[in-house]
Amino acid sequence: MEYEITDQRREYLNARGFTILTACPGSGKTTSIVYKLKTLIEECRINNSNGTGVLCMSFTNKACEEISSKYKEMHGRSIDYPNEVRTIDSFITQYVVLRYWYLIEGLSKPIIINEDEILHNLFFHKYNGGEYLPYALREYNDLAHSYKPEKVEYIGHNIFKIENTIVSKDNDIRLFNYCNAILHYRLTHGALKSSDAMLVASNILKKHFVVAQSLANRFPYVILDEAQDTSYHQFEILELLKDAGLSNLELVGDVNQSVYEWRNARPEIFQQYNEKEEWNHLILMENRRSVQRIIDFYSRLKPIGYPNIVSYGVDDANIQIEIIRYDNGQERMAFDRFCEICEGYNLKSRLVLVRGKTDLTKLAAFRTSIKPWKSEIPYRIIDAELLFVQNKIKEALEKMGWICAYLIYGDGHFSEMKNYLKERGNTIEFNIMLLKLLKSMPPLSLSFNRWDESMRLLLRNGLNITEDLDFKFKQRMKGYNMNRLRNQSVDTYFGQVEENVVTAQTIHSAKGASVDAVLLYLHDRSGAQVISFNDLPDNSNGLAEIKEKHRLIYVACSRAKQLLTIAIPSTITENQIRRKLNGLDFHISSRGVQMVLNL
C-alpha cells in the first residue's frame, strides 16, 4: 500500500504530546493513523519499559478491524502485544470496569448488556398476561410503561436521558427519582449498559488515582479515532488518564461527521479542544475521494471558520450534481433516473440514503435473488446477520433463536422446538448466547466457501453440536458456474451495498462508506425526524450553528466520489432550487412530474 506524505500529513506524523487532528471526509485519516502507528510502536519499544504499548481506539468493531487489516497490509505484520486496537467501550470495560468493579461499594460483578430486549426482561416480571416491575421498584409501575427502564441513561451532571426526554431534578423530581432507582437497580444487579460502565469507570479512576496511573503507564501513546462521537464520560476518562501522566494523546475526527448524539456523542466537547492552548491543532483537508463540485455542495454545511476542503488527485468524470424532482408516491421514479445516470457513466458502487428507518419502507430494495444452498438455514442466518447490522436486535434474536432450535432438534420436531424456545427464550443466558453468535458471525465479505465453512464451525462450537452440519451448497444452478460462485463474496448477492445493485439504507449505517454515486432523499417540509430541502443553507458562508441534521446531510453527500443526486418532492419548484443552490454546478430533472411550477 502506497502512502503519499504531503505537508499536512507530515505535520501530523511528526506530532507528539497532545494533538487534535481535524480530518475532512476522504482525507485518508485511517491510513495516516496506520502509517504513524508503526513509528509510535517502535518509539514506545525503545523509550519505555517492557509491557508498555500503543493503544489505538475507535468506536466500532468494524473500524477497529479496518485499522488492524490496513496495518497488516501496509507494514506486513499484525499489531501485537503489548500494543492494542480496541473500541473505546471495550478498552474502558476490560481495563477498568471488569478489573476494578469491586472498588465501587454496592456494585455487583458486572456484565455489559446493550440489548434492550434483555434489559427489559431484567426489569419486568410477567404475571397473568401483564408485566410488572420487581418489588424494589413497584412504586414506579405507572412510569415504567411510558418511560421504559431499559431506555434510562445517565449522561452526567445529575441528568438522565430516556430516548428524547431529558430528565433532571428541576424539571420532574419524581421522574428523576425513578431514573435514579433504575440506575441503582442495574448497578446492584451488575447488569450494566455501556453508558453505566462509563460512569462506573469514571468513578473508579476519580477515587483511585493509582488505577489511572497504571493505565497511563501501560499505554503511554493513545490514539482515539472518530473522536467527535465521544461521550461526556469517555472524555472525562481520557482527561483523568492525562492527569495521571499520559504523555501522548491524539484525538482524530471531524465535528461535521458526528451523527451519534442519540448515542450520547458530545461533538461540542470535541470542538472545545480546538480552543485549548496545550494541544497541537492540525488539519487534513486534502480529500482523495470526491470531486470538487460535490465538496462544494456539502461544504455549505460546515461551521464558519472551518478550513476549506480541496479535492486532491481525484479524476473528474465531469458529472453535474443531479437534483431530481418527483411527485408524491413516485419515489421509484427518482431511483430509476439515478440508476440511468449511473449506467451512462459506468458508476458501479452506489448508495441510496434516507434519514431514518420510517423512510426505508417507502423505497423498494432491488437485488439479484439467488439460492445457492438447498438448506434454508444459511438464508435465515444471513437475514439475522443483516437485521443485527441494522440494529434490529429483537428481530435478529428471534430469528437466531429459531435457527438454534432447528439445528438442535431438526425437521419434524416443531413441538420440541417450541417448548425449547418457550423455556429459554426470555432468559438472559440464552439471549447472551445468541448475541455472542451474532457478534461472532463471519463477515459477508468472505467467499461463499469460506463463509459456509466458518459459519458451520461457529454453530457447532456455539451450540455444542457433535454432528457435522451441511448447508448443501448446490452442484448445479442455471446460469451460474458453481465453482466460480463458490469463490465470490456472499455480499455480492446478499449484502447491504452491492456492485450494480442498490438497497436503501439509513445515513448512520453508511458512515465510513465510499462509493461512486449517492442518491439522497430529502423531504419538502421540516420535521423533528426528517431532513428536508429547508435544511440546506442558502449560501457558502458556513453555518453559525451546525445541528445534527446538517451533519447527517454532510455525511451522506460526502460518501460520493463522482455523482451526487438529491431527490426532492415536486412541491419544491425549480426556481426555489436555483435560488437555494446558487453558485453550485447542478442540473434539475423534472421528468415525469405532472405539474412543473416555476414560482
Please place each PLM-identified region on the residue numbering.
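Accessory N-terminal region flanking or inserted into the helicase ATPase core
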Residues: M1-P25, T31-S32, G53, N128-P220, ...
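Coupling/switch/interface segments within P-loop NTPase motor domains and analogous charged loops
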Residues: E105-R186, G412-R460
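Conserved coupling/interface region of RecA-like P-loop/ASCE motor cores
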Residues: Q257-R263, Q271-Y312
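Conserved helicase/translocase motor-coupling segment
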Residues: G329-K474
